[in-house]
């Protein structure tokens, strides 16, 4: 009888693991965390998730040398929507990427999406192997 009670608990314990390791959520891992260009960029801090699984999101940084942050957002949607991934903008700003001297400066705000958490952006950039050795300064 004890064995049957133990087995009845199994579905409740397995269900969260099924959600974590489903093929929908694995598609988030295939999205690069950082995509920025050299020089002065506008950037967005974006929380991505598969539709219906907002708890299991991932934060990414996207930047480009464009006229406004909406252009970056449009390119993010073009990249992610075919994969069934939703995007929520957490804010934006500017990044001065001096790749030759291995320095970066994160500052400013987006008029459209508001200010991003620049410290969080710095942590994401430093976790990325390309920018691990960079000296990254933040100005709020």
Curated annotation (Swiss-Prot):
Transmembrane annotation, as ranges: none
GO cellular component: cytosol
Disulfide bonds: none
Domain of life: Eukaryota
Active site: 69 (proton acceptor)
Any one GO biological process: sex differentiation
InterPro entries, sorted: Janus, Janus_sf
Record: residues binding substrate: 42, 110-112
Keywords associated with the record: Differentiation, Sexual differentiation
GO molecular function: protein histidine phosphatase activity
Family named by the database record: Belongs to the janus family.
Protein's job: JanA and janB regulate somatic sex differentiation.
Protein name per UniProt: Sex-regulated protein janus-B
Name of encoding gene: janB
